[in-house]
Amino acid sequence: MDYKESLLLPKTDFPMRGNLPQNEPVKYKQWDEKKVYEKMKKNRVGCPSFTLHDGPPYANGNIHIGHALNKILKDIINKFHYFEGKSIRYVPGWDCHGLPIEQKVEEKIGSEKKKELPKSKLRQLCRDHATKFVEIQKDEFKKLGVIADWENPYLTMDFKFEANIYRELCAIAKQGLLIQRSKPVYWSWAAQTALAEAEVEYEDKTSPSIYVAFEMSNESKAIHGLENKKAAFVIWTTTPWTLPANTGISLHPVEMYVLTSDGYIVAKALYSKLKEEAVINGEIVTEFEPFMFESNIAINPLNGRTSKIVLGDHVMMDSGTGAVHTAPGHGEDDYKVGLRYNLDVIMPVDAYGKYDETIVREKLFKDTNKYLGLNVFKANELILEELGSALLKRVDIRHSYPHCWRTHTPIIFRATKQWFISIDDKYGNKNNTLRENALEVVENLKFYPEWGRNRLKAMLEGRPDWCISRQRDWGVPIAFFRNKKTDEIIFDEKVLNYTAMIFEQKGCDAWYDLEIKELLYPGSGLNPDDLEKTLDILDVWFDSGSTQNAVLRSRNYDAGTFPADMYLEGSDQHRGWFQSSLLTTLASSEIAPYKSILTHGFTVDEKGEKMSKSKGNVVAPDKVIKEYGSEILRLWVAMSDYQSDLKISDNILKQNGELYRKIRNTARFLLANIDDLEEIIDVSKMGPLDKWILNKAKKVFDEIEAAFNVYEFSKGLNKLNNFLVVDLSGIYLDVCKDRLYCDDKKDIHRLASQSAMALIAKKLISTLACILTYTMDELLEFAPAFIKDGCEDIFDFKKVELPVVESSLDESILLSAKEKFSEIKDALSKEKVIKSTLELMLYTNSEDILALDEVEASDWFLVSQVSKDKQNSDILGSFQIDGKDFEVYKATAHKCPRCWKFTANAEESLCKRCEEVIK
């Protein structure tokens, strides 16, 4: 007789295969139609809130794997807090102004046509370009399963947004921190604009490393009794092109200096090194304290101009000569020491990085004709020739040098008139500097990982004033009126407010389109003819730094609370958005914009190498989604230690695919075996093994939640994977199969195991909903009603807590006994003594095993019987655990044709249990 129909075999419509690439878009469309973001808001009315403020990606080009990592991690954290019961707000945004977009438009229309276009037309083309890529990227982000307020994103080019950026600028001006001055700044000659620190990237470059002698003037030699003797300061530089603008030589204020027998002056601390390198050859003749040279004069060998000897703390003793070539127009330290000593600031380089008429006017070269209009980097070799015998040594070195982030060309330091936010002027209620306020705030923030605190602190401690002006067309103008006669900037509050109002109504294009009389506040009492517009635009980092005001503090978006609970970006944003947002908020209102900062690393290939098209190791999100589905990408993010660089490749994605299948199959097995369960029974009615797995699950899921609470998702998922593979699938689900399939539908053993499985299934859905949202939604769709609990979809699902269950079992003894038994079983199988463990029975005098009832004990070892009585038959194997005996025998009863256990009284007859079930 075939008893298969009488078995309660697993049954579920939940598919074994996810078919993620096909099913995810369908599911997301359903979510969109149901407006799940709005539903999430309604579901958490009156609940504690969590606000993650989105750092805006740039609206240019398709998203790359770094974007996917960032957005998925944000989505996981938002959903984690949501499923924990919090009300979340997530307004996505885009950075829409700036050089990259302007360059793309220029590439499209050509540089000549760009020059002919009215500024308003060019700006419209830039706006169109940004709008196009906002829509493209929005669609790409949705494909990652990200839930957000996609209907109401923030765009930095929206009129109201531009007005609020401008208002933030005005608030900073009101605090007295906005200053305009001529100062050396990072300058991209390829893009013809100033750059902020965050727009500078370091790449390797080959430069001439040169040592040059500056002979002391006769008057200065006379002061030291060196008349008619050679005495020259030796400077070291890797930028020969800056030598024409030299106006000083900086010495360390306390280090000793020496004059050598061959007539050169260097720091005593560096003398031996310089002699070893054959820069100088003479012995030490005289020692000097540095103050003895202060305000002495040396002669620039390139042009015969004077160079004042000054003292500066910036002079280092780890390299060079201890005598630093000082050109205040070409460096921050040079500029600062130049201010103290009133050194001339000479700037002979134009916006295109070429020598201009200044070299003629100031006689910076003996023959200016061959340098006029020449790119400074191309001038290096000519300058070295002109130095003649003053060039003591030249070595070409490969070193890290600042480059423009967009054009990837080496930049220069160039003194120009720019707008700055002062970092070290006192202001506000505390009468602190912006730097002091920022450093104080950083001490009170939470950082994930913790090392981010010191990194941000170090950058704030060392940063210069923030140069916020750019000489380009596509951006928010620094829209002030200047008095033509007095050069005074008009900071009248009513005038500024009126400009902001116009920007809100017409956009900041109005600054270019309208006449001054149309832009000027009617009641200002100012004559439009006396005024001119300032035409620089704002650094895009100021745009993104202002999002805290334009998004979180304005009433234009339902974006959550201010300050935000979290900012989350790549680790490069310690020098970017984390700083720009902090500095703008503190400068305008002395408040920190965020309570915590989480940073992630960069994406690299499986060898840890940077991705590039030339290497062919780029992993495109779109390709991954089409091949694997976004769930696998989301699992990769969650399983990676994002605090360092994240490796990704086809192999790594396949490994995550395997993990996904394990999770899916385990979940499917749980669903299939609780299909006919009507309600979860009380824990008190469960057996020891059911209580053991629930006790184990409770501990594991509590550990997972603790890890998730500090955003250590990989740690939590590794614990989950271990539990699913080892404890749940490897042991519990295996030992339950007999009772699930063969017991009566209402048998207490079966109901207890089903109930334990149902509780674990609910907790699994609750825990993984933030990561595998598509799959958990699908799982819920096929789950029994008592798990759904009235939920329409996963976004209605509430946090599940497993019951606290005391387990009396000694897990270590049970597991050790199971392991030892498995060794004997494997040997018997290998020797073909048995085909199945059900052919065996086990004797033991272990109280821990006998504490289980007979059914649970035999199920634990997957044998037909566990007895406290020794058998008379042959012992097939034995072992001891904790001093207790275990003996393995062949089962003496007959095989039951229904459950296959050797517990039947006669051949081909049913065992007692199966007989009762069939009746």
Curated annotation (Swiss-Prot):
Keyword Cytoplasm among UniProt keywords: yes
Binding site residues for ATP: 613
CDD domains listed in its UniProt record: Anticodon_Ia_Ile_BEm, IleRS_core
InterPro entries cross-referenced by the UniProt entry: aa-tRNA-synth_I_CS, aa-tRNA-synth_Ia, Anticodon_Ile_BEm, Ile-tRNA-ligase, Ile-tRNA-ligase_type1, Ile-tRNA_ligase, M/V/L/I-tRNA-synth_anticd-bd, Rossmann-like_a/b/a_fold
Cellular component aspect of the GO annotation: cytosol
Cell location: Cytoplasm
GO biological process: isoleucyl-tRNA aminoacylation
Domain of life: Bacteria
Binding site for Zn(2+): 896, 899, 911, 914
Subunit structure: Monomer.
Task of the protein: Catalyzes the attachment of isoleucine to tRNA(Ile). As IleRS can inadvertently accommodate and process structurally similar amino acids such as valine, to avoid such errors it has two additional distinct tRNA(Ile)-dependent editing activities. One activity is designated as 'pretransfer' editing and involves the hydrolysis of activated Val-AMP. The other activity is designated 'posttransfer' editing and involves deacylation of mischarged Val-tRNA(Ile).
NCBIfam families membership: ileS (TIGR00392)
Protein name listed in UniProt: Isoleucine--tRNA ligase
